[in-house]
Amino acid sequence: MSLNEVHRLQTPVVTVLGQDPAHRKCVLNGNAFQQDAIISFKGWQYAVFYSSCSSSSLNDDTQREPLFVCMNRRKLPNSEWQTIVFDDYHQTTDDGHNTVQMGICPGDGTIHLSYDHHCDTLRYRRSIKGIASDPEISRWTKDVFTLTLDYVPGITKPHENFGYVTYPRFGVLGNDMYFSIRNGKAGLGDDLLYIHHAATGLYEYAGKHLKGIQNNPYVHGMDYRDGKLHITWVYRGFVHYDGWDDPLDTKHKQQAGPNGADNNYNICYAYSDDGGYTWKNGHDKTIALLRDGGSITPDCPGLVAFDIPKGRGLTNQEAQAVDQDGQWTQHAIGPVPSPRRGRLAISKTGDLFLILPDPTNSSLRILKSSKAKDYAESVEVWRGVGFMGEPLVDSKRLEEEDVLSIFAIAVSATSSKDRQVVVLDFHI
């Protein structure tokens, strides 16, 4: 890792969360569809990742198994990280979909985790109340969390939607918190929305907010701002193959085959101003009432923000950021050398930061687009080498403190098998 190639931002402060499992073929720490692997709340920062908790010098890969969910916290701005290792759950599947997701409910201070899914039974755990609200007095041990559950509190068990889960996602919803999942397979699935109510500590099934019809939505992001929950997504059309309707079929898990990203099309947008129950298009027209059993379907009017045909290199689950004005803009930033996905984030002053990886030279670069210039120009303000994976960002800290915290994987200059999960802090 080298931090001094291009330097218009100050040198970042780099802290280590833990060892990355370099022996795995797939990257598990740092994927674009992790909505929040790093979050700030009430002056503390939290991060989640997988690690084997063993030495990177071990020659036998079997000694580095299994992996464990790890959760770190620190008091901002610069206290030491404190770590919980959830060693009661063994992660053994080498599949890049099976990441860790985290959410914090503002109203009751609970922390929620969901992990290790690619069309699998739900895996979920949560903390006791108040652990994030009063971190100074809350002990940081695994026994303040539940064991791994296959349901969420408040939803009758067994629940038909929790048997085929991918892409869990948590996010703030005012005083409450939302939880969304995909139910189905690549090209053939729906997105479902649950609401965790702080007042009761229970979840409510709000409904199927995105319904696929011979396709499935891939969500770029879900962001809550000024009473509105914003969502963007692409669709992926489904291509039938032998055995697609077999309940035991696993071909769709192999990250190859006919239902890949070549079938992605269109960038779509909708929002809800009543906490996820009623959805409107960009023209403020109601298109789905979840309380009445409705869903946003591909044929709903006014969904398409940008019309992009199949086969144009449109990648699923890219990035989304909602600025204070909530206006669409479109500007080219030049070609990118690979399909690795980046991140978008808005600063305290409304400027846009683009964090872009380049695996062709193991670099990470940061571009800045000024709000004052209507985001028309993107200027590179930092570049470093020795990074891999897809960067993640603590969006809340940037917007509230003008500190850009980037979650990334740093690769040793001497050995590609020596990788660390790190946080880079830039004072912008």
Cite the ranges covered by each PLM segment.
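Extracellular, repeat-based ectodomains that mediate carbohydrate processing or recognition
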Residues: M1-I428
